[in-house]
């Protein structure tokens, strides 16, 4: 995570012997030391992604990230995202990273106000690592969901002002007795509510309606990690085809979606070479160059 102003964080004295003890002038208050975001909220709120400045108003000048998709397959889950960020009707960036590995068995995709969403993902990764270091054990998947929901809820004030940032969480539940069904996808609303997806796929962002429609039609083809990754690429291609804020594969610049595969072996980023190959296959299969389209000329000698 990026620390714009590095300074020593003051921890309150939690000693039971004195209710008035202080550390660097900070009064003793109850605090969940295993929560990194809670520590920042109490000790250094200026380091949080959003501080609830009521003077801020929504504006198209703020970059927004767009479409994220996730699909379960037997033995795991895949998450993928496009690379475009927009400012109103302008393209702000063509190579934004929107899918982040947050620990060994989870990944987070971001959509919405880019600055807040990116800090969500980074802070969440620190949150999980901080808990594991203090407690000596990793959070359960349910615990990871609750931690992220709390962070999203903390951004409600900004969301009500128009600065919405919504994550999509994918992971592998180590406590599931059936490893083939241990893939998990969780979506969130702006108030911190969360939903465990049972249909096997989900999408967030401006192109989500088109991506979900694509996955609904193609999900029956998912049998393993390779087929799930292909369907994810196709869904993002369909979203980019109808949503101007979602970027499709850019063959000229060599920019392609990013993706993460999560299985019992852990989370790993999919190589750009692998995704580029799938993207080219999708484009080739959908090309009309060798088919009779509306502008194709009928063969000579045939009746019109």
From Swiss-Prot:
Q: Where is the active site?
A: 66
Pfam families attached to this UniProt entry: Proteasome (PF00227)
The record's annotation in InterPro entries points to: Ntn_hydrolases_N, Proteasome_sua/b, Proteasome_suB-type, PSB_actinobac
**Which residues does the record annotate as propeptide?**
1-65
Task: List the PANTHER family.
Answer: ATP-DEPENDENT PROTEASE SUBUNIT HSLV, METALLOPROTEASE TLDD
- Give the record's GO biological process terms: modification-dependent protein catabolic process; proteasomal protein catabolic process
Pathway participation: Protein degradation; proteasomal Pup-dependent pathway
Q: What does this protein do?
A: Component of the proteasome core, a large protease complex with broad specificity involved in protein degradation.
* Keyword entries, A-Z: Autocatalytic cleavage, Cytoplasm, Hydrolase, Protease, Proteasome, Threonine protease, Zymogen
Locations listed in the record = Cytoplasm
Enzyme Commission designation: 3.4.25.1
Give the organism, scientific name: Mycobacterium sp. (strain KMS)
Provide the catalytic activity annotation.
Cleavage of peptide bonds with very broad specificity
Stated name of the protein = Proteasome subunit beta
Q: How does it assemble?
A: The 20S proteasome core is composed of 14 alpha and 14 beta subunits that assemble into four stacked heptameric rings, resulting in a barrel-shaped structure. The two inner rings, each composed of seven catalytic beta subunits, are sandwiched by two outer rings, each composed of seven alpha subunits. The catalytic chamber with the active sites is on the inside of the barrel. Has a gated structure, the ends of the cylinder being occluded by the N-termini of the alpha-subunits. Is capped by the proteasome-associated ATPase, ARC.
In Gene Ontology terms, what is one molecular function of this protein?
A: threonine-type endopeptidase activity
Gene Ontology CC terms:
cytoplasm; proteasome core complex, beta-subunit complex
- Gene encoding this polypeptide? prcB
Q: How is its activity regulated?
A: The formation of the proteasomal ATPase ARC-20S proteasome complex, likely via the docking of the C-termini of ARC into the intersubunit pockets in the alpha-rings, may trigger opening of the gate for substrate entry. Interconversion between the open-gate and close-gate conformations leads to a dynamic regulation of the 20S proteasome proteolysis activity.
The record's listing under CDD domains reads:
proteasome_protease_HslV (cd01906)
Family indicated by similarity: Belongs to the peptidase T1B family.
